[in-house]
Amino acid sequence: MFQGADSQAGKSGSRSMKPPGGESSDLFGSPEEGISSSKPNRMASNIFGPTEEPKNIPKRTNPPGGKGSGIFDESTPVQTRQRLNPPGGKTSDIFGSPVTATAPLAHPNKPKDHVLLCEGEDSKSDLKAATDSTPRGEQSDKGSSKEVEHAKIPEPTPTVDSHEPRLGPRPRSHNKVLNPPGGKSSLSFY
């Protein structure tokens, strides 16, 4: 006949009170059982100090024989090396050799006209040396050669017709993106 919940109330051991895998499959741990392990808890944090270690286990850096392996004794000459450059300075001392400070490298597709303006006194002295090394016959014919040299050498002005293809595409005067990173869409934004 029909047996309800009243008939199971009298039984002391019911199946619903046991875990599905038996009593040994305690995945999350229960507060009733004490952990009886000689190893420290791996998840324990050592923020507030070192954990207590057993006293009977010898440390590997100090063997029972009394003599060390000598691995850690020779590390002092490496630490006596002095720093030549401050950290984060203009030069990098990663590999141990001093590197002279150089001008930042320009993009390979851009013209290098701005380099003469940025370098400073060195480029000006090079320009003066170049004007002084003109042939002597021209100086006697023209009088003051420096004024004539500056008038004769105009600054290069890039034009669209004289564009070199090795420098990349021709410069554009508008801001329309022709090839966006995500590809073209059917919408056009001007």
Curated annotation (Swiss-Prot):
Q: Please name every pair of cysteines joined by a disulfide bond in this record.
A: none
Q: Which residues carry this modification: Phosphoserine?
A: S30, S45, S69, S97, S144
Residue ranges, compositional bias (Basic and acidic residues): 110-129, 138-153
Could you list this entry's UniProt keywords, alphabetically sorted.
Acetylation, Cytoplasm, Nucleus, Phosphoprotein
Going by the entry's taxonomy, the superkingdom of the source organism is recorded as Eukaryota
- Biased region (Polar residues) positions are 1-15, 35-44
Query: Where in the cell does this protein reside?
Result: Cytoplasm; Nucleus
Single GO cellular component term: cytoplasm
Q: Which residues carry this modification: N6-acetyllysine?
A: K11
Residues where N-acetylmethionine occurs? M1
Give the principal location in a single coarse category: cytoplasm
What exactly does this protein do?
Answer: Nicotinic acid adenine dinucleotide phosphate (NAADP) binding protein required for NAADP-evoked intracellular calcium release. Confers NAADP-sensitivity to the two pore channels (TPCs) complex. Enables NAADP to activate Ca(2+) release from the endoplasmic reticulum through ryanodine receptors.
The family note in this entry says: Belongs to the JUPITER family.
Record's subunit section:
Monomer. Dimer. Interacts with TPCN1.
Listed name of the protein: Jupiter microtubule associated homolog 2
